[in-house]
Design a protein with these regions (language model features):
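Residues that define the loop-to-transmembrane-helix transition and helix capping
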Residues: 7, 84, 122-123, 141-142, ...
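Residue-level recognition of pore/gate-forming positions within transmembrane alpha-helices
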Residues: 17-18, 46-50, 94-95, 129-133, ...
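Membrane-interface "cap" regions at the ends of multi-pass membrane proteins
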Residues: 1-25, 136-139
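Hydrophobic core positions of alpha-helical segments in small-molecule transporters
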Residues: 89, 127, 147-150, 249-252
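Helix-loop-helix module between adjacent transmembrane segments
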Residues: 41-136, 218-226
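Loop-to-helix junctions at membrane interfaces in multi-pass transport proteins
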Residues: 2-5, 26-33, 37-43, 78, ...
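Membrane-water interface regions at transmembrane-helix termini and the short interhelical loops
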Residues: 30-36, 57-63, 108-116, 130-152, ...
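Structural signature of transmembrane alpha-helix termini at the membrane-water interface
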Residues: 51-59, 103-110, 134-141, 160-171, ...
Length: 272
């Protein structure tokens, strides 16, 4: 693996891999339905846990790989546990499942290109595939790192623009926050949200209710633990320059998830 000389670029690429468009749309829509309990709950696990994991777990992964000198994450796992069978199993799983993921991504990108350019779907998919292939062959993980860094910059700029416009527009409406709270209060008592334990636009669900359990188990435990165990994140930890780089990497890496949470707040505001 190449070593990244820029902690900022590594942090931006790290953060960019944590957030996807589908996650923003999905959780944004959910926030528009049930209110601020979604983004407020996500602040602690997404920002706090990811930062702590990067600062405290990242250096250990880096030091372990410095001794092993593995070229891939799969190789590092096998050498660390001194079990080649693990590497073979992980490689088999990767080779078997990655094509399904690639097909889904290529279909989405192909339809996007077709919609905005008018190019035939087949030509769009072939052209994009050749572009990705050339990038990987030419630069390897360095190309992936730079691509993710650019994606992270775009996400930051786009989020700040959307944030500024949305806040400016809604601030023009007198008492817009009271209107949001009032709209939630107008929901009939027998509505499904009340049955699940939700109590208001800017309040938490009742403790141990179905709504509280849904938010806690999904957003506090399941997703953050899954995020910090993603192989592509471990791979970026392996690419750090030294074990002192991780505070900078973590600081820049949590910016993008933080902005995503702001996006969920904006979704809750604009949807209501």
């Amino acid at each position: 693996l190449p070593t990244s000389d820029s902690n900022i670029s590594l942090g931006l690429s790290y953060g960019a891999t944590l957030i996807s468009t589908s996650a923003i749309i999905g959780f944004g829509g959910l926030a528009g339905w049930i209110g601020f309990s979604i983004p407020l709950t996500m602040i602690i696990p997404f920002v706090g846990l990811i930062y702590i994991a990067t600062v405290y777990i990242g250096p250990k992964v880096w030091k372990a790989n410095k001794k092993i000198k593995a070229k891939t994450y799969i190789e590092m796992i096998g050498k660390h546990y001194n079990t080649p069978m693990i590497s073979k199993l992980l490689a088999l799983i990767t080779v078997g499942l990655i094509p399904f993921y690639c097909v889904a991504v290529l279909i989405g990108v192909g339809k996007f290109i077709t919609t905005f350019t008018g190019i035939e779907f087949v030509h769009a998919v072939i052209g994009f595939s050749l572009l990705v292939f050339g990038t990987i062959v030419y630069g390897g993980m360095s190309s992936v790192l730079k691509n993710d860094m650019i994606q992270g910059i775009i996400v930051i700029l786009g989020s700040l623009i959307v944030l500024s416009i949305t806040v400016f527009v809604h601030m023009q409406v007198p008492g817009f926050w009271d209107n949001l709270v009032g709209a939630w209060a107008a929901v009939p008592e027998g509505d499904g949200l009340y049955k699940l334990g939700f109590t208001g636009f800017d309040t938490w669900p009742e403790f141990w209710s179905r709504g509280w359990l849904m938010i806690t188990t999904l957003l506090v435990f399941t997703i953050p633990v899954g995020l910090i165990t993603l192989p592509q994140l471990q791979t970026r930890w392996m690419m750090a320059k030294d074990d002192k780089s991780f505070k900078t990497i973590a600081s820049w890496g949590v910016i993008i998830p933080g902005l995503a949470i702001v996006t969920f707040m904006l979704a809750a505001i604009s949807a209501n």
